[in-house]
Amino acid sequence: MADVNRGNRPLSPHLQVYRLPLAAITSIMTRITGHALVAGIVLITWWLVAAVTSPGAFACADWVVRSWLGFIILTGSMWALWYHLLAGLRHLFYDAGYGLEIEQAHKSSQALIAGSVVLAVLTLIVFFVF
């Protein structure tokens, strides 16, 4: 059977035209940071297990943790922890019915990103200064 209304149907937005809202991007990032925290947990767990295993195992694990790759993983995990924590707090406000309007969700997304970066930088400063 022929479709007589073929030209009158609405078209989907093209992927190059459609932009995800910032709230959607931060929601996706919350899921990604939750999974990325595993990398830091694995590295710290390996370091702690090596500390009670033998001096040679600890020396190897300690070298990895203190290397530039270990620093990047631990710093990224620390940022992911702050991001995930702040996103969880924002979600509690959503559950209570606050901040659900588009403009409020956009502002809370901006605050989430800025807050996580500021807290991560402050944590690094405290870690290296004190």
Curated annotation (Swiss-Prot):
Membrane-side (Periplasmic) residue stretches: 53-68
Membrane topology according to the record: Multi-pass membrane protein
Record-linked Pfam families: Sdh_cyt
SUPFAM superfamilies xrefs: Fumarate reductase respiratory complex transmembrane subunits
Required cofactor(s): heme
Transmembrane segments: 27-52, 69-89, 110-130
Keyword vocabulary terms for this entry: Cell inner membrane, Cell membrane, Electron transport, Heme, Iron, Membrane, Metal-binding, Transmembrane, Transmembrane helix, Transport, Tricarboxylic acid cycle
Subcellular location: Cell inner membrane
Electron transport among keywords: yes
Top-rank lineage group of the source organism: Bacteria
Cofactor note: The heme is bound between the two transmembrane subunits.
Protein name: Succinate dehydrogenase cytochrome b556 subunit
Classification of source organism: Bacteria, Pseudomonadati, Pseudomonadota, Alphaproteobacteria, Rhodobacterales
Gene that encodes it: sdhC
